[in-house]
């Protein structure tokens, strides 16, 4: 996406930010905002389906546990699957992968949800320890658009690919993330 170097006032800058987010250009959105685009909210209970899908790492049977945040708008500025960083769980920010959208494989209600799978689940939280915590999720890089899969097996394979892609992204951007990380909500 190409946006000119000059924006006409606040309205032009706002439009440029919305266009960058809609296009999935999270680096441009971060430059325009002066920080990574983020969503804050309290972690809520979900259907607990993620923990029954696959394994977060080879040899583990923990599935893809997620932190679920309700999204108040029916049309978020950005949708899809993203590399993210989670703040607010104590300790350093946690790397993750997140889906922001309507979960087309799981339900057709049209309800927007942010589901975050932390690549390194903090053991101190246990399986249930994040509920009701206020977290901030920074959307760092868009991996792909949201998609409808033919079943849970296909969805699990896609999530596993997303997790691998997120690990690779963090590996390639490790030094950059260390320099810009601030753990505050």
Per-range role (PLM):
Residues 1-34:
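Contiguous mid-protein beta-loop-alpha structural module that forms a pocket-lining wall or clamp
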Residues 1-5, 40, 46:
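Conserved beta-strand termini and adjacent loop/short-helix elements that scaffold enzyme active sites
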Residues 30, 40, 93-95:
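Acidic/polar loop patches that form or flank catalytic/metal-binding clefts of enzymes
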Residues 46-185:
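Phosphate/ribose-recognition catalytic cores of enzymes acting on nucleotide-derived substrates
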């Amino acid at each position: 996406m190409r946006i000119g170097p000059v924006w006409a006032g606040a309205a032009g800058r706002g439009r440029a930010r919305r266009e960058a987010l809609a296009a999935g250009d999270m680096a441009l959105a971060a430059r325009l905002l002066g920080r990574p685009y983020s969503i804050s909210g309290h972690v809520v209970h979900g259907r607990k389906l993620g923990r029954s899908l696959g394994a977060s790492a080879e040899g583990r049977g923990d599935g893809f546990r997620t932190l679920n945040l309700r999204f108040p708008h029916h049309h978020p500025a950005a949708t899809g699957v993203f590399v993210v960083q989670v703040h607010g769980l104590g300790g350093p920010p946690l790397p993750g992968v997140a889906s922001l959208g309507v979960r087309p494989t799981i339900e057709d209600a049209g309800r927007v949800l942010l589901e975050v799978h932390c690549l390194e689940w903090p053991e101190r939280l246990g399986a249930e320890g994040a509920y009701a915590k206020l977290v901030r999720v920074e959307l760092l890089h868009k991996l792909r658009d949201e998609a409808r899969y033919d079943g849970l097996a296909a969805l699990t394979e896609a999530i596993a690919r997303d997790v691998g892609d997120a690990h690779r992204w963090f590996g390639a951007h490790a030094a950059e993330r260390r320099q810009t990380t601030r753990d505050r909500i």
